[in-house]
Amino acid sequence: MLVVSSPFTRLLVCFLLSGLLLVPSPIRSEDATGLGQLRTISLSKLDSLLPPGTHVLIERSAIEAFLVALEGAPPDWATVYGQGHHDPGHDERLFNLNRDRDVAREGNPALNWHMAFIWPGELSQFDPDTKSYTVAVGPAFNVTGWGMVRFKPEEFPSNLRVRPNKKLAALISRSLAKREKAEVVVVMAGVLIPTESIIYDFSHEEEGVGLIMPVVRVEQVEVVLKPHAR
Protein backbone atom coordinates (compact mmCIF):
# COMPACT_ATOMS: atom_id res chain seq x y z
CA MET A 1 0.00 0.00 0.00
CA LEU A 2 1.30 3.45 -0.98
CA VAL A 3 1.74 5.84 1.98
CA VAL A 4 1.93 9.56 1.17
CA SER A 5 3.64 11.22 4.11
CA SER A 6 4.25 14.83 3.13
CA PRO A 7 2.62 17.62 1.11
CA PHE A 8 5.50 17.56 -1.38
CA THR A 9 5.20 13.80 -1.83
CA ARG A 10 1.45 14.09 -2.31
CA LEU A 11 1.98 16.78 -4.94
CA LEU A 12 4.57 14.65 -6.73
CA VAL A 13 2.28 11.61 -6.76
CA CYS A 14 -0.59 13.68 -8.17
CA PHE A 15 1.70 15.06 -10.87
CA LEU A 16 2.91 11.61 -11.88
CA LEU A 17 -0.58 10.16 -11.96
CA SER A 18 -1.87 13.04 -14.08
CA GLY A 19 1.01 12.47 -16.49
CA LEU A 20 0.04 8.83 -16.84
CA LEU A 21 -3.52 9.81 -17.63
CA LEU A 22 -2.34 12.11 -20.40
CA VAL A 23 -0.29 9.49 -22.25
CA PRO A 24 -2.00 8.93 -25.63
CA SER A 25 -3.33 5.49 -26.54
CA PRO A 26 -0.89 3.49 -28.67
CA ILE A 27 -1.67 2.49 -32.23
CA ARG A 28 -2.99 -1.05 -32.06
CA SER A 29 -2.46 -4.20 -34.15
CA GLU A 30 0.91 -5.15 -32.73
CA ASP A 31 2.11 -8.17 -30.80
CA ALA A 32 4.02 -7.97 -27.51
CA THR A 33 7.26 -7.19 -29.37
CA GLY A 34 5.76 -4.16 -31.11
CA LEU A 35 5.73 -5.89 -34.51
CA GLY A 36 2.60 -6.07 -36.64
CA GLN A 37 1.39 -9.25 -38.27
CA LEU A 38 1.47 -9.41 -42.07
CA ARG A 39 -2.09 -10.14 -43.18
CA THR A 40 -3.26 -12.00 -46.28
CA ILE A 41 -6.95 -11.18 -45.98
CA SER A 42 -8.96 -9.86 -48.93
CA LEU A 43 -9.72 -6.14 -48.73
CA SER A 44 -13.39 -7.03 -49.13
CA LYS A 45 -13.17 -8.75 -45.72
CA LEU A 46 -11.45 -5.95 -43.81
CA ASP A 47 -14.47 -5.70 -41.52
CA SER A 48 -13.20 -8.78 -39.69
CA LEU A 49 -10.08 -6.84 -38.58
CA LEU A 50 -11.83 -3.59 -37.67
CA PRO A 51 -14.17 -2.47 -34.89
CA PRO A 52 -17.90 -2.93 -35.62
CA GLY A 53 -19.43 0.00 -37.46
CA THR A 54 -16.19 1.11 -39.14
CA HIS A 55 -16.75 2.86 -42.48
CA VAL A 56 -14.29 1.39 -44.99
CA LEU A 57 -13.46 4.27 -47.35
CA ILE A 58 -11.70 2.59 -50.24
CA GLU A 59 -14.17 2.63 -53.13
CA ARG A 60 -15.00 5.92 -54.83
CA SER A 61 -18.70 5.60 -53.96
CA ALA A 62 -17.93 5.14 -50.25
CA ILE A 63 -15.57 8.13 -50.19
CA GLU A 64 -18.11 10.35 -51.93
CA ALA A 65 -20.89 9.22 -49.56
CA PHE A 66 -18.66 10.17 -46.62
CA LEU A 67 -18.02 13.62 -48.10
CA VAL A 68 -21.73 14.17 -48.74
CA ALA A 69 -22.54 13.22 -45.13
CA LEU A 70 -19.87 15.55 -43.74
CA GLU A 71 -19.66 18.43 -46.21
CA GLY A 72 -22.90 18.39 -48.16
CA ALA A 73 -21.65 19.45 -51.59
CA PRO A 74 -18.30 19.98 -53.34
CA PRO A 75 -16.81 23.47 -53.36
CA ASP A 76 -16.84 25.61 -56.49
CA TRP A 77 -13.24 24.81 -57.32
CA ALA A 78 -13.13 26.99 -60.45
CA THR A 79 -14.17 30.10 -58.52
CA VAL A 80 -11.74 29.41 -55.68
CA TYR A 81 -8.89 28.74 -58.09
CA GLY A 82 -9.50 31.83 -60.22
CA GLN A 83 -6.41 32.53 -62.31
CA GLY A 84 -4.27 30.17 -60.28
CA HIS A 85 -1.62 30.53 -57.59
CA HIS A 86 -0.54 33.91 -58.95
CA ASP A 87 -4.07 35.31 -58.68
CA PRO A 88 -3.94 37.96 -55.89
CA GLY A 89 -7.15 36.63 -54.32
CA HIS A 90 -6.36 32.91 -54.63
CA ASP A 91 -4.93 32.35 -51.15
CA GLU A 92 -7.65 34.37 -49.45
CA ARG A 93 -10.42 32.45 -51.23
CA LEU A 94 -8.83 29.14 -50.26
CA PHE A 95 -8.45 30.29 -46.65
CA ASN A 96 -12.10 31.39 -46.55
CA LEU A 97 -13.21 28.05 -48.00
CA ASN A 98 -11.44 26.13 -45.24
CA ARG A 99 -12.68 28.48 -42.51
CA ASP A 100 -16.29 28.41 -43.67
CA ARG A 101 -16.33 24.63 -44.04
CA ASP A 102 -14.84 24.19 -40.56
CA VAL A 103 -17.70 26.23 -39.10
CA ALA A 104 -20.38 24.51 -41.20
CA ARG A 105 -19.42 20.97 -40.11
CA GLU A 106 -19.47 21.70 -36.38
CA GLY A 107 -21.72 19.19 -34.62
CA ASN A 108 -22.07 16.99 -37.70
CA PRO A 109 -22.46 13.33 -36.60
CA ALA A 110 -20.15 12.22 -39.42
CA LEU A 111 -17.27 13.82 -37.48
CA ASN A 112 -17.53 10.85 -35.13
CA TRP A 113 -17.42 8.15 -37.79
CA HIS A 114 -14.84 5.46 -37.21
CA MET A 115 -13.26 5.04 -40.63
CA ALA A 116 -10.58 3.10 -42.45
CA PHE A 117 -8.56 4.07 -45.51
CA ILE A 118 -5.57 2.63 -47.35
CA TRP A 119 -2.16 3.72 -48.54
CA PRO A 120 0.12 1.68 -50.83
CA GLY A 121 3.34 0.26 -49.46
CA GLU A 122 6.25 -2.10 -50.07
CA LEU A 123 8.25 -4.46 -47.90
CA SER A 124 11.94 -3.69 -47.96
CA GLN A 125 14.71 -4.18 -45.42
CA PHE A 126 14.72 -7.48 -43.52
CA ASP A 127 15.80 -7.62 -39.89
CA PRO A 128 17.08 -11.14 -39.07
CA ASP A 129 16.91 -10.52 -35.32
CA THR A 130 13.17 -9.84 -35.29
CA LYS A 131 12.43 -11.70 -38.56
CA SER A 132 10.50 -8.67 -39.75
CA TYR A 133 10.40 -6.34 -42.74
CA THR A 134 10.35 -2.57 -42.88
CA VAL A 135 7.24 -1.19 -44.57
CA ALA A 136 7.78 1.78 -46.89
CA VAL A 137 4.50 3.70 -47.24
CA GLY A 138 3.32 6.39 -49.64
CA PRO A 139 0.08 8.38 -49.82
CA ALA A 140 -2.85 7.37 -52.02
CA PHE A 141 -4.74 9.87 -54.16
CA ASN A 142 -8.36 8.89 -54.83
CA VAL A 143 -10.12 10.29 -57.88
CA THR A 144 -13.69 11.35 -57.03
CA GLY A 145 -16.38 13.66 -58.32
CA TRP A 146 -15.31 16.08 -55.59
CA GLY A 147 -11.70 16.27 -56.73
CA MET A 148 -8.68 14.32 -55.53
CA VAL A 149 -9.04 12.89 -52.02
CA ARG A 150 -5.98 12.06 -49.94
CA PHE A 151 -6.56 10.75 -46.44
CA LYS A 152 -3.92 12.15 -44.13
CA PRO A 153 -2.93 10.49 -40.83
CA GLU A 154 -2.40 12.95 -37.99
CA GLU A 155 0.58 10.83 -36.96
CA PHE A 156 2.08 7.73 -38.51
CA PRO A 157 4.45 5.14 -37.00
CA SER A 158 7.96 6.19 -37.96
CA ASN A 159 9.26 2.62 -38.09
CA LEU A 160 6.44 0.39 -39.29
CA ARG A 161 7.54 -3.26 -39.41
CA VAL A 162 5.69 -6.53 -39.99
CA ARG A 163 6.55 -10.15 -39.37
CA PRO A 164 5.27 -12.71 -41.91
CA ASN A 165 4.75 -16.38 -41.17
CA LYS A 166 7.42 -18.81 -42.39
CA LYS A 167 5.68 -19.62 -45.66
CA LEU A 168 5.20 -15.97 -46.57
CA ALA A 169 8.71 -15.09 -45.40
CA ALA A 170 10.22 -17.58 -47.85
CA LEU A 171 8.05 -16.27 -50.70
CA ILE A 172 8.90 -12.64 -49.96
CA SER A 173 12.60 -13.43 -49.65
CA ARG A 174 12.62 -15.06 -53.10
CA SER A 175 10.75 -12.12 -54.63
CA LEU A 176 13.13 -9.53 -53.19
CA ALA A 177 16.15 -11.62 -54.23
CA LYS A 178 14.86 -11.40 -57.82
CA ARG A 179 14.44 -7.62 -57.36
CA GLU A 180 10.67 -7.98 -57.52
CA LYS A 181 8.46 -5.74 -55.42
CA ALA A 182 6.67 -7.15 -52.39
CA GLU A 183 3.69 -4.81 -52.46
CA VAL A 184 1.34 -4.35 -49.54
CA VAL A 185 -1.70 -2.30 -48.63
CA VAL A 186 -1.47 -0.35 -45.38
CA VAL A 187 -4.88 -0.05 -43.75
CA MET A 188 -5.29 2.78 -41.25
CA ALA A 189 -8.36 3.17 -39.06
CA GLY A 190 -9.40 5.91 -36.68
CA VAL A 191 -11.48 9.07 -36.36
CA LEU A 192 -11.21 12.58 -37.76
CA ILE A 193 -9.38 15.11 -35.63
CA PRO A 194 -11.94 17.41 -33.95
CA THR A 195 -10.86 20.72 -35.54
CA GLU A 196 -9.76 21.38 -39.13
CA SER A 197 -10.93 17.84 -39.90
CA ILE A 198 -10.85 18.45 -43.65
CA ILE A 199 -8.21 20.49 -45.46
CA TYR A 200 -9.01 21.92 -48.88
CA ASP A 201 -6.15 22.68 -51.25
CA PHE A 202 -5.13 22.28 -54.88
CA SER A 203 -3.10 19.51 -56.45
CA HIS A 204 0.57 20.28 -57.03
CA GLU A 205 0.65 17.81 -59.92
CA GLU A 206 -2.44 18.86 -61.89
CA GLU A 207 -3.20 22.54 -62.41
CA GLY A 208 -6.55 23.59 -60.99
CA VAL A 209 -7.54 20.18 -59.61
CA GLY A 210 -9.03 20.40 -56.13
CA LEU A 211 -7.48 18.35 -53.33
CA ILE A 212 -9.42 17.28 -50.22
CA MET A 213 -7.50 15.92 -47.22
CA PRO A 214 -9.45 14.37 -44.33
CA VAL A 215 -7.10 14.32 -41.31
CA VAL A 216 -7.47 11.11 -39.31
CA ARG A 217 -6.25 10.27 -35.81
CA VAL A 218 -5.03 6.74 -36.49
CA GLU A 219 -5.82 4.15 -33.84
CA GLN A 220 -5.14 0.93 -35.74
CA VAL A 221 -2.78 -0.11 -38.55
CA GLU A 222 -2.97 -3.34 -40.54
CA VAL A 223 -0.57 -4.40 -43.30
CA VAL A 224 -2.03 -6.67 -45.99
CA LEU A 225 0.08 -8.44 -48.61
CA LYS A 226 -1.23 -7.83 -52.13
CA PRO A 227 -2.54 -11.01 -53.83
CA HIS A 228 0.01 -11.02 -56.67
CA ALA A 229 2.83 -10.85 -54.10
CA ARG A 230 1.71 -14.09 -52.40
Describe the residue ranges of each PLM region.
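Residue-level detector of alpha-helical hydrophobic segments embedded in or interacting with membranes
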Residues: L2, G19-L21, V209
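Bacterial N-terminal signal peptides that target proteins for export
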Residues: M1-V13
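OB-fold and OB-like single-stranded nucleic-acid-recognition modules
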Residues: I27-R230
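Serine residues within intrinsically disordered or low-complexity segments
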Residues: S5-S6, S18, S25
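Bacterial N-terminal signal peptides
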Residues: L11-L22
